[in-house]
Amino acid sequence: MTVQTFTPNQTTTLDTAKKTIEQQSQELTPSGGNKIGFVSLGCPKNLVDSERILTQLRTEGYEIVNSYHDSDVVIVNTCGFIDSAVQESLDTIGEALKENGKVIVTGCLGAREDEIREVHPGVLGITGPHAYENVLEHVHQFAPKPEHNPFTSLVPDHGVKLTPKHYAYLKISEGCNHRCTFCIIPSMRGDLVSRPVGEILSEAERLKNAGVKELLVISQDTSAYGVDSKHSLGFANGSPVRQNIKALSEELGKMGIWVRLHYVYPYPHVDDLIPLMAEGKILPYLDIPFQHASPNVLKAMKRPGRAERTLDQIKKWREICPELVIRSTFIVGFPGETDEDFEMLLEWLKEAQLDRVGCFKYSPVEGAAANDIDDQISEEVKQERFECFMLVQQEISAAKLQKRIGSTMKVIIDEVDEEGAIGRTYADAPEIDGLVYLNGETSLKAGELVDVLIEHADEYDLWGSLVRA
């Protein structure tokens, strides 16, 4: 066991994150205090919660270790979004109990305490998501707070990070105001609560000063940032800043590093972000989960959007910012999805020509309203539709990447080994999108930004050579 993450990948896998997490644990100064093992599962938003807990534990003098057997207590930060994630969480809790015996559970699955207790009655304590203080209380109970000189800092200014040093997730809000019928996030994390803009920008500045070259802005609903405060004025560095996603993006764009927006809900005011991308202030990359194209399915999901309107919106965005890359996610096999609905989705996909796409087969989630919808789709039909959908998108992706051949692109290096370097362009987020391979380039370092001549492409990835000055 190590301090680790589990993130489902939709296209390709990169081991950088786990390696860096192991290195992070080794690089932390030993404190001599009680030792904590930590397992972080699920999405980047959960990863940020783990970073916050670990930062506080280090501040209090606890030591973070890499094995079950060396730990006085093991914390498992769980995911409970879909059935496979629930099973992953329960299996991990069971492994920690078997190997160590003293386990504290937190995270999204922690909101369903009875379900955990039924399978694993021996856990020491259970808390829901972002219940940081409750987690620490459980730790204090079973691994007393070490005697620690408060004037000896065990934590870097930017806190403990579970990502490689050159990129970091920046969470701007918690919770969600939407009630999509396939989702139970609001029941676990509550309604949307935005962080003060000054607090976000201060964290971003600390991360930049620590060497971060890429900020990945995340939340449950990034484009709704500030709606809970009615987009009131906040302050950053003594200057007023409106608490909305456009103003926040403008401020982040002044830092001179890559800024990538994730989980952007398809509101009309997303239009305001595109000029910032066209001007080079933030990356021309939009992660926007459309989920489907059929009006009937979208209505059943309680999702916004009409197929023709979103297509017009995408066309308008690309006219303003031709370099724009759009990533999206979709659900096939949603209850009540007819053959006609699915064909409509495929036609929309062909028309939209999205750059990066993830697809999920609908999976019932305990507590989700969609479970009560009539006409559940068989697993066989779900699989057929999934394969058909991904084949269509694979052809789109391959054609788009072929057009990159012969161009020179800026690439951020993620990993270097004895065979060469692996990086990403602005079009690719870590863990979920494609990669750029530079065979033989063993002298580069993670975090470097280099120019690469693209020479080859497949359905998801690129190969190229370094452009030397």
From Swiss-Prot:
This protein's UniProt keywords: 4Fe-4S, Cytoplasm, Iron, Iron-sulfur, Metal-binding, S-adenosyl-L-methionine, Transferase
Keyword S-adenosyl-L-methionine annotated: yes
Cofactor note (record): Binds 2 [4Fe-4S] clusters. One cluster is coordinated with 3 cysteines and an exchangeable S-adenosyl-L-methionine.
Binding annotation for [4Fe-4S] cluster 2: C176, C180, C183
Catalyses which reaction(s): L-aspartate(89)-[ribosomal protein uS12]-hydrogen + (sulfur carrier)-SH + AH2 + 2 S-adenosyl-L-methionine = 3-methylsulfanyl-L-aspartate(89)-[ribosomal protein uS12]-hydrogen + (sulfur carrier)-H + 5'-deoxyadenosine + L-methionine + A + S-adenosyl-L-homocysteine + 2 H(+)
Gene Ontology BP term (one): tRNA modification
GO molecular function: 4 iron, 4 sulfur cluster binding; aspartic acid methylthiotransferase activity; metal ion binding; protein methylthiotransferase activity
PANTHER family named in the record: RIBOSOMAL PROTEIN S12 METHYLTHIOTRANSFERASE RIMO, RIBOSOMAL PROTEIN US12 METHYLTHIOTRANSFERASE RIMO
The name this protein goes by in its record: Ribosomal protein uS12 methylthiotransferase RimO
